[in-house]
Amino acid sequence: MGDYVLRCLTGGEVLEDHYTLACPHHPGFVRAEYTAKQLTVRENLPGVFRFSDWLPVRGSVPTRSRPVTFQNRELCRELGQPNLWITFTGYYPERGCYVPTGSFKELEALPTIVRLNEAGGGTLVVASAGNTGRAFAQMSAEFGTPVVLVVPESSADKLWTAGYFDHSSIRLVTVRGDYTDAIKTADKICEAPGFFPEGGGKNIARRDGMGCVMLDGAVTIGKLPEYYFQAVGSGTGGIAAWEAAIRLIGDGRFGSKFPELHLSQNLPFVPMVRAWNAGRDHIIDEDMPDAQASISAVSAHVLTNRTPPYGICGGVYDAMKSCGGQMYTVENKDAASAASLFAEAENGIDIDPAAAVAFASLISAAEEGSIRTNADILLNITGGGYQRVKKDCETAKIGVYETVDTGEVPVL
């Protein structure tokens, strides 16, 4: 399962994988090339590991966390799109979704901890605006993998676990600053021996874990969708969708055309949208005017990465150029309306603010006629069901280990 080689996208050379995040000789992403050219969905394996053929792991851990793809006829009628498919990764038992932290970030955390343990283990250092940190905290509480979570001070209340309450392997460090400041602090922690960065977009386990959304969608629909909608902060989910599509096209059973990527950001913080619409392969300061105030004003704080892998080889720009598509800006009020519409159609389920941004962009595209009626559309609902989790499961907040200023290194 998951046999692969690791290839540098810039230089083309094959690298040894020792939880390798980057090529030592070239900038740009590395990518897993799997021995299995056709995907076998392994129903006997738990959760997301059913897609182990295309995950960079040999084994698995017990889990029910996986994406689930379905249709809602009411939403299809509302949008005038009869072939709208929703891939939901969250907590929604009526739809067979049992992700305890409510976020698709568990699709990244699960293969990452298995990959690290198979490479010899260590302490993972995770910078997060909330959802990623919660996913890795859940994995740490369940499986004992030591983690250091580094989050903005304002995100501390988003860090909790469901059903598992031993937090002895978790150190939560809060930073007086934003998500990018948390990343800088995490990088400094990783300079000490025994501490390993989870890697963000550079981590093939994270990207290929997220790519399982596209895999589940294509397997359920029976082919690749024409359009793929997701909200992005780092843009790694869009990259993951592109890479999964490359593999599905290579499989030969799901079509030969890339899905268009329709990616969205939350106004007023929309640096990638500005760069893409200007035709640039890089982000400039003018794409983030008054960044701190803009970050404070969004409803989806997980979408506020100031240093996304946009122009890097294998990054967001390359994904968009390969697949085609559009980028959207979404106002808070439109995201809130989209969330209400989803809840009305789906048993009151609350979707993540980022997922609401994605859904709002789809509503806008349908209203403006920028997507073809009757086309197969895949909407990535990246999280939801938080109220149900807290109703059905006991949850425990993670205590803060230390609060630091930007760039300050905590004593661990």
Curated annotation (Swiss-Prot):
Principal EC category: transferase
Residues at which pyridoxal 5'-phosphate binds: N131, T382
Keyword Transferase: yes
Pfam families found in the cross-reference section: PALP
Pathway where this protein functions: Cofactor biosynthesis; coenzyme M biosynthesis
Single GO molecular function: ATP binding
Coiled-coil ranges from the UniProt annotation: none
Modified residues (N6-(pyridoxal phosphate)lysine): K105
Cofactor: pyridoxal 5'-phosphate
UniProt superkingdom: Archaea
Enzyme Commission code: 2.5.1.76
Keywords assigned: Coenzyme M biosynthesis, Pyridoxal phosphate, Transferase
Subunit and partners: Homotrimer.
Entry protein name: Cysteate synthase
Origin species: Methanocorpusculum labreanum (strain ATCC 43576 / DSM 4855 / Z)
Lineage of the species this protein comes from: Archaea, Methanobacteriati, Methanobacteriota, Stenosarchaea group, Methanomicrobia
